[in-house]
């Protein structure tokens, strides 16, 4: 099962995201949730989720700063930025910071989430395969050094 971390300062939104989708149908489970970027950064380090859905506008640390810090720290999972603002500059900033997807909260429903999750599942599968391939190459390289 792939792990999901939900990040939003609004408890109702977090509960909606948790309950709207049958996560297991896509091979995911909600591993945790956070109310701001600082809490999410700590949880992401501990849980190592494959997918993080984060609000953009939050107190203490907003979603864009969270995305920047996660990417700078080497996080290679899928990041989805959520916002209620249909603002091109905000979308652009989120994507430039390292978000893979951007979703408007007022467009979230079961159908849009299912469509997004099918796409995300493919991304997560591909990233896992790439990581596995990288680990195998590193192991082969170490073995090659030992046999010299």
PLM region descriptions:
Residues 8, 55:
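Active-site residues of response regulator receiver
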Residues 11-32:
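Two-component/phosphorelay signaling modules centered on CheY-like receiver
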Residues 47-53:
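Active-site beta3 strand of CheY-like receiver
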Residues 49, 63, 75, 95-100:
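As written
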Residues 58:
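Receiver (REC) domain active-site loop signature in two-component systems and cognate sites
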Residues 92-148:
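Interdomain helical linkers/hinges and coiled-coil/dimerization scaffolds
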């Amino acid at each position: 099962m792939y792990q999901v971390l939900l990040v939003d300062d609004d408890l109702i939104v977090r509960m909606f995201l948790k309950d709207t989708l049958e996560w297991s149908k896509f091979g995911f489970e909600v591993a945790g949730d956070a109310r701001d970027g600082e809490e999410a950064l700590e949880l992401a380090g501990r849980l190592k989720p494959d997918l993080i859905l984060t609000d953009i506008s939050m107190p203490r640390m907003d979603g864009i700063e969270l995305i920047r810090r996660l990417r700078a720290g080497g996080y290679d999972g899928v990041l989805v930025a959520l916002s209620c603002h249909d603002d091109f500059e905000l979308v652009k900033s989120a994507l430039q910071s390292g978000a893979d997807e951007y979703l408007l909260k007022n467009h979230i429903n079961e159908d849009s989430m299912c469509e997004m999750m099918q796409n995300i599942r493919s991304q997560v599968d591909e990233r896992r395969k790439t990581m596995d391939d990288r680990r195998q190459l590193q192991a082969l390289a170490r073995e090659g050094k030992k046999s010299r």
